[in-house]
Amino acid sequence: MKPVNIGLLGLGTVGGGAAAVLRDNAEEISRRLGREIRISAMCDLSEEKARQICPSAAFVKDPFELVARKDVDVVVELFGGTGIAKEAVLKAIENGKHIVTANKKLLAEYGNEIFPLAEKQNVIVQFEAAVAGGIPIIKALREGLAANRIKSIAGIINGTSNFILSEMREKGSAFADVLKEAQALGYAEADPTFDIEGNDAGHKITIMSALAFGTPMNFSACYLEGISKLDSRDIKYAEELGYRIKLLGVTRKTGKGIELRVHPTLIPESRLLANVDGVMNAVRVNADMVGETLYYGAGAGALPTASAVVADIIDIARLVEADTAHRVPHLAFQPAQVQAQTILPMDEITSSYYLRVQAKDEPGTLGQIAALLAQENVSIEALIQKGVIDQTTAEIVILTHSTVEKHIKSAIAAIEALDCVEKPITMIRMESLHD
């Protein structure tokens, strides 16, 4: 059989990794696929780098030239971002080229434009590497769990944030200090905003939510809250209470709509997700027939991500032989069945909450706080005074039972208005993961 010819757009960490996987595992791939995968053309800012990676491939400076080449069957987009990457992908699809991409931002923000065009052009778009690197969660959601109604997904899907939180817990260090360490180790970018403020995880949970529930991409409705304001005291107190704080991406189908959110979360330390540390990723899926499944592995890095990229190329080489009616739908459901659904505003979600209050250490303070929580129908699971800070101020930690978020916010506003409360209240959501 004739080889599958690919064109690489971008030869950075993942692009170089993909070339290495194709070179080092060429025999294994051919045994599985029955034919060779060949890099026929490459596009990058550095021609020297391209020549080093694959001397036999054509080098082109213009990405639009690459996506028009007759000797390219599959365009592998590894530029990242939504500028030239978006335009090149759309032009490649118009030219009838199949697509492999690791670009979660592109899909979460422009998937509603890309996938319909691909269907119109009978083109396959594969994107396993866009979510959780080498973990095959996209294939699980699109194929392995196809017999199930998915109830919820919760994932640790940003290695930078997970490394920072793990180090803060283990060393008791402040956020700013651990961020510097992460940057020195290469785990965080010079500008870490995309990772630490939840954008990266938001793109990933948006994609998984669309696959789980048969909706268009809804990134603009995804709630994002990062870890930059977390205090090491909260991580310490959470651990003392039997919890660990993780940046969690959550999507859940309820009777009122779909929850779609990213934020720091207290997870019981007995749960497997709570014990995912360092730069590792994990995704928990709860479905009606199979129950709870967990997917764990490297969520980033050259070879883990490249492994997913090459697996997608192999899938395309197999699927392209099938007529379009027998291909796996891009968003797991048949295109006509992909339907918009309500994304719940945060005020309407239901959760338990961790509160840390700094208040005057005087009689009646706890009673006033408890009364205001009760006034909003917020039930207290635990209330602990952690000690006196400066002889006059006490630090109080409260865990609530499950309640609607607008009620806890109203209670917090009322408590903050008390004369005895000295500082803004810290609120962190909790997930039992027992749904």
Swiss-Prot record:
pH dependence: Optimum pH is 10.5.
Regulation: Neither NaCl nor KCl increase the activity. L-threonine and L-serine do not markedly inhibit the oxidation activity.
Binding site for NADP(+): V14, K104, G186, E189, G301
Temperature-dependent activity: Optimum temperature is 40 degrees Celsius.
Entry keyword annotation includes Ribosomal protein: no
Coiled-coil stretches noted in the UniProt entry, renumbered to this chain: none
Reaction(s) catalysed (UniProt annotation): L-homoserine + NAD(+) = L-aspartate 4-semialdehyde + NADH + H(+)
Protein residues bound to Na(+): E128, V131, G133, I135
Obligatory cofactor(s): a metal cation
UniProt pathway annotation: Amino-acid biosynthesis; L-methionine biosynthesis via de novo pathway; L-homoserine from L-aspartate: step 3/3; Amino-acid biosynthesis; L-threonine biosynthesis; L-threonine from L-aspartate: step 3/5
SUPFAM superfamilies reported for this sequence: ACT-like, Glyceraldehyde-3-phosphate dehydrogenase-like, C-terminal domain, NAD(P)-binding Rossmann-fold domains
Top-rank taxon: Bacteria
ACT domain location: 354-429
NCBIfam families assigned: PRK06349.1
Family designation: Belongs to the homoserine dehydrogenase family.
Protein name: Homoserine dehydrogenase
Organism from which the protein derives: Neisseria gonorrhoeae (strain ATCC 700825 / FA 1090)
